[in-house]
């Protein structure tokens, strides 16, 4: 049974013993945000860096600024969107996407660490990350950008205070600290919710769809553990007015789980899915079809890539 207060005290002590001057990689998800807040309690020099990769949702940067301010986090926000998106050009393989993003993250952090004089990199890696990335004797299911995307030789000492926690435990500690509860968001961001090549046009489509899914899902009394749209490289025939269309397809993923290691597709109120579909096809002209993913984990992973 996890004791949040003890875990926080132990983590602060661990950080103080292992980090003299460090840089913390904050993706904006629950894991790295929790680590940023815990690290701010340590009596050591830590700079929390949030990178605008260009692969974020519409309100991510605003939310992070508010958390940095509310919890006195020594934070910095860097705009590196052009760099990330340019490196993903013509890349369609999901593993390659993750590794490119991971390597680019490390490059940016090493540069910032050098400027800051840091010798350590703190990351919000948790147990499912290194298990799925082939930790121990397990096969790699998929590389997580903060595990499988790391270069073999890195100029920073890696420190991972949360690596033995599971998702439900992260949420428990976050609640104890009064952090706003947010659904999990992958480190590689929207890049792995676009099947195929990532482009600015596709990112803009997916951001609009994400806003709709998150707003309509907020009306549910019992929200799924995770809920998001995926942009598919599939065009289908449709009708708009009396005109034929040949538009793109959005898949909706609602998943229920306790720890992120296994889960089942959610069965939300049908009217919510109907509203999501109607709004997406009405408000996003590039989309003319919405489908619902009814696959559990396993055999599928939560994210499509």
UniProtKB/Swiss-Prot annotation:
List residues of the GMPS ATP-PPase domain.
Answer: 1-186
User: Could you name the Gene Ontology cellular component terms for this entry?
Assistant: cytosol
**Domain of life (superkingdom):** Archaea
Sorted UniProt keywords: ATP-binding, GMP biosynthesis, Ligase, Nucleotide-binding, Purine biosynthesis
What protein am I looking at? Answer: GMP synthase [glutamine-hydrolyzing] subunit B
Membrane-spanning ranges: none
Give the protein's biological function.
Catalyzes the synthesis of GMP from XMP.
Name the residues that bind ATP: 27-33
Q: What Gene Ontology molecular function terms does this protein carry?
A: ATP binding; GMP synthase activity
Q: In which pathway does it act?
A: Purine metabolism; GMP biosynthesis; GMP from XMP (L-Gln route): step 1/1
According to the record's subunit comment, the protein's assembly and interactions are:
Heterodimer composed of a glutamine amidotransferase subunit (A) and a GMP-binding subunit (B).
Tell me what reaction this enzyme catalyses: XMP + L-glutamine + ATP + H2O = GMP + L-glutamate + AMP + diphosphate + 2 H(+)
Q: Which organism is it from?
A: Picrophilus torridus (strain ATCC 700027 / DSM 9790 / JCM 10055 / NBRC 100828 / KAW 2/3)
Q: What is the E.C. number?
A: 6.3.5.2
Enzyme class name: ligase
Gene name as annotated: guaAB
Q: Which InterPro entries match?
A: GMP_synth_C, GMP_synthase_B, GMPS_ATP_PPase_dom, Rossmann-like_a/b/a_fold
Gene3D superfamilies under this entry? 3.30.300.10, HUPs
């Amino acid at each position: 049974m996890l004791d949040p207060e003890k875990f926080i005290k132990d983590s602060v002590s661990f950080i103080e013993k292992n980090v003299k001057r460090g840089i913390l990689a904050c993706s904006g998800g629950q894991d790295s945000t929790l680590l940023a807040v815990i690290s701010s309690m340590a009596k050591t020099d830590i700079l929390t860096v949030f990178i605008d990769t260009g692969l974020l949702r519409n309100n991510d940067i605003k939310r992070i600024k508010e958390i940095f301010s509310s919890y006195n986090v020594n934070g910095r926000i860097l705009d590196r969107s052009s760099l990330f998106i340019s490196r993903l050009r013509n890349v369609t393989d999901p593993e390659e996407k993750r590794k490119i993003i991971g390597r680019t993250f490390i490059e940016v952090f090493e540069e910032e660490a050098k400027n800051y004089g840091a010798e350590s990199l703190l990351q919000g890696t948790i147990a499912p990350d290194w298990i799925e990335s082939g930790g121990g004797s397990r096969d790699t299911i998929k590389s997580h950008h903060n595990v499988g995307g790391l270069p073999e030789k890195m100029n920073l000492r890696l420190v991972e205070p949360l690596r033995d926690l599971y998702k439900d435990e992260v949420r428990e500690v976050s609640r104890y600290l009064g952090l706003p509860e947010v659904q999990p968001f992958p480190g590689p961001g929207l890049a792995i919710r676009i099947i195929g090549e990532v482009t600015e046009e596709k990112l803009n489509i997916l951001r609009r769809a994400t806003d709709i899914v998150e707003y309509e899902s907020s009306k549910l009394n019992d929200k799924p553990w995770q809920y998001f749209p995926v942009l598919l490289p599939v065009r289908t025939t449709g009708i708009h007015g009396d005109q034929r269309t040949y538009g793109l397809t959005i898949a909706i993923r609602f998943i229920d789980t306790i720890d992120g290691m296994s889960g089942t597709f959610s069965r939300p109120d049908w009217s919510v899915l109907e509203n999501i579909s109607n709004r997406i096809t009405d408000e996003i002209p590039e989309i003319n079809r919405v489908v619902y993913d009814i696959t559990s984990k396993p055999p599928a992973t939560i994210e499509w890539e």
